[in-house]
């Protein structure tokens, strides 16, 4: 259900950690509702038989982790996963309560962050260590520079180093559907699909699989797949793994294949009715899923707290809603997984803010899920020393590590060192001696609401009532990526756009004005929102009377598009007679092809 889309933007940094700290008590959803009583009945309906082929053991607790977030100042832009396209949410906008306008039902205590920010990753790893999580399963897409895959890979590499410092384990959920997306986006040819996946597994073998912190099952490196969705034949995977030794321990989703070594489950939102997944239906699914795994020697079970996505509010389609129910949904799904005696319990997810399946602390949910995981760890390991109160320390360490006081940064480093040593007593003593205050309340980092406003920008061209000759006219382009067609650049909607195929230069855009006219001005616009950051596009302008012979009117020229300076629009003087007008793009500092949200032409 993961959505992989792209907006290419380059933005200027803003202050995201200045501003205030507000004390917020986490919401108690339905405080008058007896969720525990309701779920006691649901637990009685769980019918998970003792597995014939799996012994009782301590499963690894691994959090499914999304390394796909981008934010200033670490990155030049807010990535797609914080704004979901920007038509409804703009992280540059600060709401009245100090939160950034992000595409999520939930708000991280740190505010929107970058997955390559060491301060954020240290904070997250410390929380995992203190809650009893053994490591993470990275959502990972290979090593190609396509869409945001390169950024995801770079963030994963940074987080792996931090996890290893904390003695935490890691594995990968490889999404083979990303190869399909690369083919559809013309990043690779269809014939190169197998070799692209093979490249990813070769990289993992060379850099991760032999690592002592990489999770192994049956002596082989654990690899999950959210599918398979593209490579569905066993022979394809055998070719992909031909040079990988030992062969990965391959785990598909929900019995998708007959050749995987094991399977894992996920919130079954396809079973929703009327937009809602009812608990009895969830219980029936859990009984069915784990029943099918009874005779299998290995299992990855999954625990999830809820499913509350933002997709409908962002302009898309929701997958449905699974109620948090005061934390009882998480307890139910964890209990079901534990009864099945899995090798791994996958916590879904640490931080998928789009789908709303988060256990990372948020303003809305506080630390509830991590407290439960801590309880489960103490049940398995009574000597586990970290407490509920200790979970409140990392946000204060993050605050110090992200600040400018070198003494506080040093104190934070010392406390982090004690956390990854697992020394709860030293953590508490150092925190007290550093004068760090913390309590059971939620203390998010919020902005000053004064940061919000985007100044008015004067239009680069005033048509003075003249008709846009290009509006709705036929367009021919040399290439496009996905459904970003040429027609979207003449539809009068700045939220839609044309973009050429990746690295297929030059990118040509030709519009037929239907009849010849004396042309005076062409206007090229991008979305004016700040998530479409400053960039330079090199454009040549050509004209024609017959669509056969084109004359270069303006040679290749770099034009600056800047939402803060010109509203992401440029005006090009023409002064010519023509029916057809062609733009040839040869460079774009903000994307891998030409981009136009609206192309307007005016004349006499």
Residue ranges and their predicted role:
Residues 558-560:
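Surface-exposed loop and turn segments in beta-propeller and other repeat-based domains
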Residues 57-59, 78, 166, 211, ...:
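Residues that flank catalytic or metal-binding motifs in active/ligand-binding sites
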Residues 462-478:
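Extracellular carbohydrate-recognition regions
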Residues 479, 484-554, 564-604:
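Aromatic, loop-rich ligand-recognition surfaces of beta-strand-rich domains
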Residues 30-462:
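Glycan-processing catalytic domains of CAZymes
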Residues 1-11:
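Bacterial N-terminal signal peptides that target proteins for export
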């Amino acid at each position: 259900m993961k959505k992989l889309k792209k907006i290419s933007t380059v933005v200027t940094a803003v202050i995201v950690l200045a501003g205030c700290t507000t004390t917020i008590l986490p919401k108690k959803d339905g405080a008058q509702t007896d969720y525990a009583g309701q779920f006691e009945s649901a637990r009685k309906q769980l019918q998970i038989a003792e597995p014939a082929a799996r012994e009782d053991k301590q499963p690894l607790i691994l959090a499914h982790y999304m390394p796909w977030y981008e934010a200033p100042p670490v990155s030049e832009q807010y990535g797609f996963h914080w704004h979901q396209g920007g038509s409804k949410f703009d992280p540059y906008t600060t709401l009245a309560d100090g939160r950034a306008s992000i595409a999520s039902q939930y708000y991280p205590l740190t505010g929107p962050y970058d997955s390559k920010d060491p301060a954020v990753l240290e904070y997250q790893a410390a929380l995992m260590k203190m809650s009893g999580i053994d490591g993470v399963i990275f959502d990972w897409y290979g090593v190609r520079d396509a869409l945001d895959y390169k950024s995801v890979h770079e963030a994963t590499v940074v987080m792996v180093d931090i996890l290893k410092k904390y003695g935490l384990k890691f594995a990968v959920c490889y999404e083979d559907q990303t190869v399909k997306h690369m083919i559809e986006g013309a990043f690779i040819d269809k014939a190169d699909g197998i070799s692209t996946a093979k490249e990813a597994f070769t990289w993992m073998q060379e850099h991760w699989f032999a690592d002592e912190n990489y999770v192994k099952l049956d002596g082989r490196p654990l690899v999950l797949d959210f599918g398979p969705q593209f490579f569905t034949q066993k022979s394809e995977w055998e070719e992909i793994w031909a040079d990988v030794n030992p062969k990965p321990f391959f785990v598909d989703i929900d019995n998708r294949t007959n050749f995987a070594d094991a399977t894992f489950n996920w919130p079954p939102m396809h079973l929703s009715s009327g937009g809602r997944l009812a608990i009895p239906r969830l219980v029936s699914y859990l009984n069915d899923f784990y029943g099918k795994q009874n005779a299998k020697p290995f299992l990855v079970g999954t625990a999830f707290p809820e499913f509350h996505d933002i997709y409908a509010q962002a302009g898309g389609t929701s997958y449905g809603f699974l109620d948090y129910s005061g934390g009882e949904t998480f307890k139910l799904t964890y209990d079901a997984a534990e009864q099945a005696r899995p090798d791994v319990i996958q916590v879904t997810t640490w931080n998928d803010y789009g789908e709303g399946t988060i256990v990372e602390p948020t303003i809305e949910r506080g630390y509830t899920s991590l407290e439960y995981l801590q309880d489960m760890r103490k049940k398995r390991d009574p000597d586990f020393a970290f407490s509920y109160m200790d979970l409140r320390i990392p946000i204060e360490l993050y605050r110090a590590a992200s600040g400018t006081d070198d003494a506080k940064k040093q104190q934070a480093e010392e406390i982090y060192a004690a956390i990854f040593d697992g020394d709860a007593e030293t953590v508490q003593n150092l925190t007290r001696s550093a004068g760090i205050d913390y309590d059971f309340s939620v203390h998010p980092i919020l902005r000053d609401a004064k940061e919000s406003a985007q100044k008015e920008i004067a239009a680069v061209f005033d048509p003075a009532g003249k008709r846009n000759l290009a509006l709705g006219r036929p367009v021919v382009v040399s290439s496009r990526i996905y459904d970003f067609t040429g027609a979207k650049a003449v539809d009068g909607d700045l939220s839609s756009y044309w973009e050429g195929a990746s690295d297929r230069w030059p990118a040509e855009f030709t519009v037929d004005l239907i009849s010849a006219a004396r042309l005076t001005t062409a206007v090229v616009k991008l979305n004016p929102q700040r998530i479409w950051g400053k960039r330079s596009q090199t454009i040549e302008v050509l004209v024609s009377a017959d669509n056969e012979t084109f004359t270069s009117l303006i040679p290749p020229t770099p034009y600056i598009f800047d939402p803060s300076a010109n509203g992401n629009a440029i005006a090009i003087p023409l002064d010519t007679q023509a029916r057809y007008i062609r733009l040839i793009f040869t460079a774009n500092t903000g994307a891998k092809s030409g981009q136009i949200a609206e192309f307007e032409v005016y004349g006499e």
